[in-house]
Regions:
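Residues that mark the N-terminal boundary/hinge immediately upstream of a DNA-recognition element
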Residues: 14, 25, 50-53
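The DNA-recognition helices of helix-turn-helix-type DNA-binding domains
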Residues: 36, 47, 61
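Short alpha-helical DNA-recognition segment
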Residues: 23-41
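Short, charged recognition helix plus adjacent turn
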Residues: 68-87
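A short, Lys/Arg-rich alpha-helix, primarily the initiator
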Residues: 1-21
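DNA major-groove recognition helix of helix-turn-helix/homeodomain DNA-binding modules
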Residues: 52-68
């Protein structure tokens, strides 16, 4: 699984996809990570959590984080980001 993640909601969707692929409930993932279920809910919603909570959940999913230079977003990424805007 390799995703380019630029926004919190993209991170949330990636975590949710991985959890579902592993057939884990939010409660089961939280237990594996040693965190409360609220952490998983917040992550999947794109809300703020501590870095240590993020790393614990990623580890419980068998994932790791890698830091790369971001560069400019692609036209598709910009279009996707603003697709839901009503303006």
């Amino acid at each position: 699984m390799t995703d380019t993640i630029r926004l919190p909601d993209e991170l949330g969707r990636a975590i949710q996809r991985r959890r579902q692929a592993l057939r884990l409930s939010k409660k089961a993932l939280a237990e594996r990570a040693g965190k409360v279920r609220e952490v998983v809910y917040r992550l999947e919603a794109g809300d703020d959590v501590t870095v240590s909570s993020l790393l614990a959940v990623l580890g419980a999913l068998g994932l790791a984080m890698r830091i790369d230079e971001a560069g400019l977003p692609t036209m598709q990424e910009v279009a996707d980001r603003f697709a839901d805007d009503d303006d």
